[in-house]
């Protein structure tokens, strides 16, 4: 959809997203002729995960390539999280804990964390794994979140903020903090 001209057109794409429970197409960002999409991906045997793909913008066809896949895949249609934000050369993403609770405290698994990668999918060398958190997966920026469905770069202080759905009304809003644990 072109919001100026009100014209619409269909674009072919190779994105294989799965509509399951709370999953499907989860977020999209456009910058410098690229699109990043977070989505729920079928990983086989009834298991799904939050994935991020990138494509060069074309009016005819989008050839998406996965640049991140949350592991492990889980047999659940809940809490994909999956919002995206770009700050400079970094792409931040939220990964919900998929309804698995304590998995958010395990830095060797992606669910329940904030992810930080470069916009091309490569891993920043100043992520927590390389600065004293050697047991953390290299893409993880922060752990201990439940179902973060908001993620944004503040124009006021240039920080990344997230909103997190808590259980039974325990929603909260806070800053994404490198190497920290929000405690879910």
Task: Describe each region flagged by the PLM.
Residues 1-102, 150-166:
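Acidic, Gly/Ser/Thr-rich repeat motifs that build Ca2+-stabilized beta-propeller blades
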Residues 23-25, 97-184:
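Beta-propeller domain segments
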């Amino acid at each position: 959809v072109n919001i100026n001209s009100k014209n619409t057109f269909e674009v072919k794409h190779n994105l294989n997203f799965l509509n399951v429970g709370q999953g499907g197409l989860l977020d999209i960002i456009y910058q410098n002729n690229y699109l990043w999409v977070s989505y729920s991906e079928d990983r086989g045997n009834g298991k799904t995960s939050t994935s991020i793909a990138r494509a060069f913008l074309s009016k005819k066809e989008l050839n998406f390539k996965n640049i991140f896949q949350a592991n492990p895949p889980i047999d659940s249609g809940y809490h994909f999280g999956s919002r995206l934000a770009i700050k400079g050369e970094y792409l931040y993403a939220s990964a919900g804990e998929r309804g698995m609770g304590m998995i958010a405290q395990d830095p060797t698994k992606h669910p329940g964390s904030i992810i930080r990668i470069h916009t091309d999918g490569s891993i920043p060398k100043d992520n927590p794994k390389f600065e004293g958190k050697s047991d953390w997966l290299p893409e993880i920026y922060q752990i201990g979140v439940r179902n973060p469905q908001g993620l944004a770069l503040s124009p006021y202080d240039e920080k990344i903020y997230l909103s997190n759905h808590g259980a039974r009304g325990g929603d909260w809003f806070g800053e994404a903090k490198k190497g920290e644990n929000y405690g879910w």
